[in-house]
Each structure stands twice: as structure tokens, then as C-alpha cells.
Amino acid sequence: MSLLTPLIWILILLPIILLALIKSEKGQLKYLGFFILYFLADCYIQQLSKQFISIEFMGLKFSWVGKILSLLMSLTIIYAVSKSNRQEIGFTTKTNAKKQVIIGLLFFFGFLFFDLIFKMILFPKGGAFDLETFAFQATLPGLTEELAFRGIGLWLLEKAFPPKWTFKGIKFGWGFIMVTVLFGLAHGVFLTANHELKFDLITIVYLSLISSLSVGVLRKFSGNLIYPILGHNTINIMNAIIRIL
């Protein structure tokens, strides 16, 4: 994947950013710059580590090093900010009201059930069990991506664009929309090393409206990152299980 790919993701997101700038109440726009810098740094840490740090000699095929470095960077930022900011990021064991948590869980599991049926029909079956696949999918992607997207990323964007829509006592805003869409873009758009653009619209729409939206709602209604991390990893494990049925 070309190093230009993360810039393409931001470029595609630009219309939503511009719309947010027009429609939002005045926020602290420096945080939009911080978000872009953080997002690009996270992307390039993972990309460059994959290029320059090989662990194939250990028989491992997934990007363990990149994900661990991403995790370390996120944790460094989280522990560098104040306790109140950590709670805003979602790095806390505190939750919202029980009723709100239940709403988030019902929303997530409703989407998860749809996701299960859809993938049971479409996913190729009969793959071999692979321990590394399960170990990786059950841990690092959910942990690192939730810290990045619905943790630090969402926190920075909500500083830039204060949420103004309220549903069941939970505030939503342009930041929520941006991280939801950006997650889909990061899984459905990439520029190859030969500068060939791959644009999978179905993947972008599906991941944005199903996976990303469901864990995003779970994050907002639960009030912390524990629930979306567990939810994200549940989706990944479910995908791996379906492929070996």
C-alpha cells in the first residue's frame, strides 16, 4: 500500500469536514489539526513498521509490530493528558446510566445479528483453523482501532466540532460521523505501490453503516472504550469463525 493512502482517506473525508465547518458551532479548530496529525502518525507507524520490521522469521503473518506500536503511541497520548481528558476519551471504567448502556448493547447486538446472517450467506467457508488468526483478531485490531478512532480521534474531533444533536441523553455530532465514515474508508480504499487506486464502495458503505456505526453507538451509550473494544473483537472473531465453518 502506498504511503499516499492515508492522505487519500483524509481527502475523501474533506467534504464532510467542510460541511462540519459550515454547520457547527464555533469549536477549537486546532484540534482538527491535532486529529489529522495523530491519525496520519498512527497510519504511518503501522505502514512503515510493516515495511521495515519483519517478523516472518517467527512464522507470523499479521502486523503485530505495527499494532503494538500504535497501541503504545495511543497510550502515551492518553497518559499525557489530564484525568478528565482521559475520561472524555473513554479511557475509564466508569459507564453511563444503566439504561443508556442497555440501549447501546441492544443496538450493537441487533446489528451483530444482521452481520452474522449476512456473512453466513456470503462469506467463503471451509477455511483451516489458524491459531494466529484467532489470537490476533481477538486482541489487537479492536484494541488499537477503538483507541484511535472512537477514543482519541473522536475526542479530538468533538473538541473541534462540539456535538449538538441529542438522542436518549447522549450527544452526537460531526466528529461521530467523521470517525464512522473514516473507519469504512480505511478498510475499503487504498493506493497500491504501483499507484493503482482500489475503491471498494460496498466495503466502505457496509463497514461504515454496520460495523463502525454499531461500535460507535456502543461507545457513546456505554461511556467508555471497554464495550466497543470487546464489541470490535467479537465482530472479528465471528468473521474468523464463519470462514472455517
What are these regions (language model features)?
Residues 30-32, 48, 91, 155, ...:
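Generic low-polarity alpha-helical segments
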Residues 1-85, 237-245:
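N-terminal, membrane-interfacial amphipathic/helix-forming hydrophobic leader that caps
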